[in-house]
């Protein structure tokens, strides 16, 4: 079941969706990512942007990012926002 489409996620966050995608879950960790999840590139002790390419290769439906990460094609399924944490909160509303 679709949790968010690219269009809905972009409207909810004010972000820019790249591509036409839909996601079925959410993950902040590539080790527990399920196929179809939205990978959220949070910045904490490590920068989640460093793991976006791996997440997409592992089957993430899209990634929530503040920039196109190194090693990720600019046509990859992304939701680009100014603030990843704030956008995640917006999606939760």
Residue ranges and their predicted role:
Residues 1-90:
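N-terminal leader/targeting and accessory segments in enzymes
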């Amino acid at each position: 079941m679709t949790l968010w489409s690219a269009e809905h996620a972009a409207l909810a966050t004010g972000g820019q969706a790249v591509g036409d995608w839909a996601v079925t879950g959410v993950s902040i960790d590539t080790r527990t990512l399920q196929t179809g999840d939205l990978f959220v590139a949070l910045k904490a002790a490590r920068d989640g942007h460093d793991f976006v390419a791996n997440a997409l290769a592992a089957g993430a439906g899209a990634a929530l990012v503040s920039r196109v990460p190194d090693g990720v094609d600019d046509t990859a399924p992304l939701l680009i926002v100014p603030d990843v944490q704030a956008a995640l909160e917006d999606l939760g509303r």
